[in-house]
Amino acid sequence: MSYAEKPDEITKDEWMEKLNNLHIQRADMNRLIMNYLVTEGFKEAAEKFRMESGIEPSVDLETLDERIKIREMILKGQIQEAISLINSLHPELLDTNRYLYFHLQQQHLIELIRQRETEAALEFAQTQLAEQGEESRECLTEMERTLALLAFDNPEESPFGDLLNMMQRQKVWSEVNQAVLDYENRESTPKLAKLLKLLLWAQNELDQKKVKYPKMTDLSKGTIEEPK
């Protein structure tokens, strides 16, 4: 084959055969799983996985308790309680991370709107969020989107209804979790997530070079499609 000739395109079946022939140590896979569970704060799952796999976590699992409490509060919509706990554990964190503090305050505003406490929501926005909105265009835009929910009888069905979705609470928790881990000088992104980002980067590079290859189109299901 000359230098100018292109190699034959690899089919999905050929690609899957190559993947199946790869030998990855189970212990390495188990360490990835344990790393994910610890980083995301899933203590009970990590304890159970340790017993099943024999893999020891990189940190004392008891140190996860505080993050678990914060997660439970945020996912229940108890934002003020979560802020108090964060301040008691890491007094300087929210002072040095103003966007994180704003997002927590914004989430409290969302919870007031969810509970149809209109007057309390307006007062909170004016006394707690207005100043940050004046200092940051990004914060102002987010605050305006949040307050726009008050214009609808059924805010859940409005164009801004995504703010009332439970995934919004999860988003705030993820931001808090990463900030706490960074503050404690601990790994804040699971190794598994880094590997998936590397996969997406590699596929993007191949796409830009117009290379045809079996592409993973659904990370959650591991779906791989034929070259196109």
UniProtKB/Swiss-Prot annotation:
Annotated GO MF terms: protein homodimerization activity
The record's Gene Ontology biological-process terms are: positive regulation of canonical Wnt signaling pathway; positive regulation of cell population proliferation; proteasome-mediated ubiquitin-dependent protein catabolic process; Wnt signaling pathway
Query: Coding gene?
Result: GID8
**Do the record's keywords include Transit peptide?**
no
Recorded family membership: Belongs to the GID8 family.
| Function, as annotated | Core component of the CTLH E3 ubiquitin-protein ligase complex that selectively accepts ubiquitin from UBE2H and mediates ubiquitination and subsequent proteasomal degradation of the transcription factor HBP1. Acts as a positive regulator of Wnt signaling pathway by promoting beta-catenin (CTNNB1) nuclear accumulation.
Report the GO terms under cellular component: cell junction; cytoplasm; cytosol; nucleoplasm; nucleus; ubiquitin ligase complex
- Grouped into one coarse class, the protein's main location is cytoplasm
Give the protein's recorded name. Glucose-induced degradation protein 8 homolog
Give the location in the cell. Cytoplasm; Nucleus
* Location of the LisH domain: 25-57
Question: What is the protein's quaternary organization?
Answer: Homodimer; may also form higher oligomers. Identified in the CTLH complex that contains GID4, RANBP9 and/or RANBP10, MKLN1, MAEA, RMND5A (or alternatively its paralog RMND5B), GID8, ARMC8, WDR26 and YPEL5. Within this complex, MAEA, RMND5A (or alternatively its paralog RMND5B), GID8, WDR26, and RANBP9 and/or RANBP10 form the catalytic core, while GID4, MKLN1, ARMC8 and YPEL5 have ancillary roles. Interacts with RANBP9. Part of a complex consisting of RANBP9, MKLN1 and GID8. Interacts with CTNNB1, AXIN1 and GSK3B.
Q: Which SMART domains match?
A: CRA, CTLH, LisH
Q: Where is the CTLH domain?
A: 63-120
Q: Does the keyword Zinc apply?
A: no
* UniProtKB keywords: Cytoplasm, Nucleus, Wnt signaling pathway
Disulfide pairs?
Answer: none
